[in-house]
Amino acid sequence: MKSISYLNTKEKNKKKLSIPSKTIFAKENEYGLKKPNWLKIKLPLNNKKINKIKLIMRKNNLHTVCEEAACPNLAECFNRGTATFMILGSICTRRCPFCNVSSGRPSLVDTKEPENLSKAAIKMKLKHIVITSVDRDDLKDGGSEHFSNCIRFIRKKNPDIKIEILVPDFRGCTELALNNISTYPPDIFNHNLESIPRLYSKVRPGANYKRSLELLEKFNLINPNIPTKSGLMLGLGETKEEIIEVMKDLRKSYVSMITIGQYLRPTKNHLTVNRYVHPKEFRELNLIAFDLGFKHAMCGPLVRSSYHAENQINCY
């Protein structure tokens, strides 16, 4: 039965990668609250750049979190020639109920991926690259050495490129993971808290709020000159006071960059949206972030952790 389940997961993932860009956006109003006007996205009439980036990905056997997570900003980012690469395969060892990435038994690590990633960065003429990954609890180091290898290959071929990594929590191997990544450190180290402590068991089963904060703080202690970053999604039942407390916790852990966006339900099988946060509330949180000492803050309904990431490094 396990082998059949694995094949179904792989087949599902294969089909998902071939979905045309114009159909990847979840019609959330079919499943819950009516989607407000400020969340409606205009799709581009010309998909030439989108298709070009997809072709580069397929030729180099690469994945983007933009496609895997059904990001609402895919069309905009692809048309700007940017993408967030997802390494270590497209199958996650965890099953967070908010996330659209496939879960199951992952494949072997592709040792050619760092080189292929470097080639894609050159082909796309990237000045800023964001690299993330699925959770790989099956690997002794959580995939951290692979992150390090990707950074090394990219810098070798693209010495001027800015590299941002969005990492998992490296459960059970934090020290090893941070040592591996610090060998070839990025320009920005990002790990998303995603939600408030009270909702963690619901939103991030298998994760731990304190552990995630410690990961960010420990990286900063090892690499004090490299900015750390984190992100939150709203609309799952949190209060404004709880959001601000999380922001304060991040500052206590030396995090200097933050992104806050609206949670959008990928399918009817995922967590239900509790409410749609008005843009005015996001603007208020943006001001609060700067008052708390964040050097960069981006808060808005469609903001995601890598949204306009190329502009964030300018604050340093």
From Swiss-Prot:
It catalyses: [[Fe-S] cluster scaffold protein carrying a second [4Fe-4S](2+) cluster] + N(6)-octanoyl-L-lysyl-[protein] + 2 oxidized [2Fe-2S]-[ferredoxin] + 2 S-adenosyl-L-methionine + 4 H(+) = [[Fe-S] cluster scaffold protein] + N(6)-[(R)-dihydrolipoyl]-L-lysyl-[protein] + 4 Fe(3+) + 2 hydrogen sulfide + 2 5'-deoxyadenosine + 2 L-methionine + 2 reduced [2Fe-2S]-[ferredoxin]. Its EC number is 2.8.1.8. One of its GO terms (molecular function) is metal ion binding. This is Lipoyl synthase. One of its GO terms (cellular component) is cytoplasm. The lineage of its organism: Bacteria, Pseudomonadati, Pseudomonadota, Gammaproteobacteria, Enterobacterales. Binds 2 [4Fe-4S] clusters per subunit. One cluster is coordinated with 3 cysteines and an exchangeable S-adenosyl-L-methionine. Residues 78-295 form the Radical SAM core domain. Keywords: 4Fe-4S, Cytoplasm, Iron, Iron-sulfur, Metal-binding, S-adenosyl-L-methionine, Transferase. It comes from Wigglesworthia glossinidia brevipalpis. [4Fe-4S] cluster 2 binds at C92, C96, C99. It comes from the Bacteria. [4Fe-4S] cluster 1 binds at C66, C71, C77, S306. Pfam families: LIAS_N (PF16881), Radical_SAM (PF04055). It is found in: Cytoplasm. Pathway: Protein modification; protein lipoylation via endogenous pathway; protein N(6)-(lipoyl)lysine from octanoyl-[acyl-carrier-protein]: step 2/2. Signal peptide: none annotated. Its cofactor is [4Fe-4S] cluster.
